């Protein structure tokens, strides 16, 4: 009697914005996405994969920026740049590099549109929201805040966590964009979006990378927020206008 050999095929793709499909014994099962259904995906060709990596600090991060198609293969890999978020905003579509703009600042935590809010450089606060809300992306390693754009179980990093990562680069390329890319995080020169709405990336001669943190600036400039900046000659944490668009790299909590 012939033996029938059953081959069990398990396909386990886990993408942000899609369902996790498992084909097991001929049955299709699905697991909900780790992102809410109103989390806007900027590119219909792909969904951002949620893959964990452990850095030299021992912390677990996503292996790519939110909105990135792949892990960076070089510092200037455009497929790894990802989206550009205004500090504290939800993933409503404003983070898409080709999103429209409007000049009316918001008085609520979640604007009812998907435009990048343009703020004049003469603004007193340089923020897309008035009055400001310092807790939109969480405080002190909390779960992420009301507008946390990261998947379930992840949040924006604190300034201390960003600083620890930067300091860990010393042995793998230095506290520069070289160290940023040589690290397990493979941080690319993702560019940024000015508060005027202009997108500046490496291709336009702007070889900079910025990663938002969840912390706001101190008493020296309380209207700003903290971010990690890195380029060919240096890397550091600094105060930046909340109306600017920077990349987001999520850390696990």
Task: Write out the residue ranges for each language-model feature.
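Glycine-rich, aromatic-lined ligand/substrate-binding cores of catalytic
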Residues: 83-99, 103-113
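Sec-dependent N-terminal signal peptides
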Residues: 4-13
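Intrinsically disordered, low-complexity segments enriched in Ser/Pro/Gly/Ala and basic residues
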Residues: 29-32, 54, 105-106
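C-terminal, surface-exposed recognition/capping segments
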Residues: 47-49, 54-94, 118-253
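Positively charged, low-complexity intrinsically disordered regions
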Residues: 19, 103, 111-114, 130, ...
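Generic detector of low-complexity/intrinsically disordered segments
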Residues: 11-12, 21, 25, 30, ...
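Enriched but not universal
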Residues: 15-47, 249-253
């Amino acid at each position: 009697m012939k033996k029938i050999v059953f081959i069990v095929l398990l396909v386990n793709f886990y993408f942000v914005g899609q369902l996790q499909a498992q084909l097991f014994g001929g049955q299709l099962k699905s697991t909900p996405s780790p992102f809410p259904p109103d989390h806007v995906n900027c590119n219909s060709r792909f969904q951002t994969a949620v893959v964990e990596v452990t850095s030299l600090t021992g912390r677990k991060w996503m292996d790519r920026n939110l909105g990135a198609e792949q892990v960076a293969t070089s510092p200037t890999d455009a497929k790894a740049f990802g989206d550009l978020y205004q500090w504290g905003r939800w993933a409503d579509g404003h983070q898409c590099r080709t999103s429209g703009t409007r000049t009316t600042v918001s008085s609520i935590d979640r604007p009812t549109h998907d435009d990048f809010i343009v703020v004049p450089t003469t603004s007193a606060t340089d923020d897309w929201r008035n009055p400001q809300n310092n807790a939109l992306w969480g405080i002190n390693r909390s779960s992420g805040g009301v507008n946390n754009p990261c998947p379930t179980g992840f949040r924006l990093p604190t300034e201390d966590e960003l600083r620890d990562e930067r300091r860990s680069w010393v042995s793998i390329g230095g506290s520069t964009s070289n160290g940023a890319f040589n690290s397990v995080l493979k941080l690319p020169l993702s560019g940024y979006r000015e508060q005027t709405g202009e997108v500046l990336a490496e291709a336009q001669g702007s070889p900079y990378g910025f990663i938002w943190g969840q912390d706001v600036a101190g008493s020296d400039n309380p209207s700003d927020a903290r971010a990690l900046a890195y380029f060919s000659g240096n890397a550091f944490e600094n105060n930046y206008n909340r109306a600017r668009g920077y990349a987001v790299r999520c850390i696990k909590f």
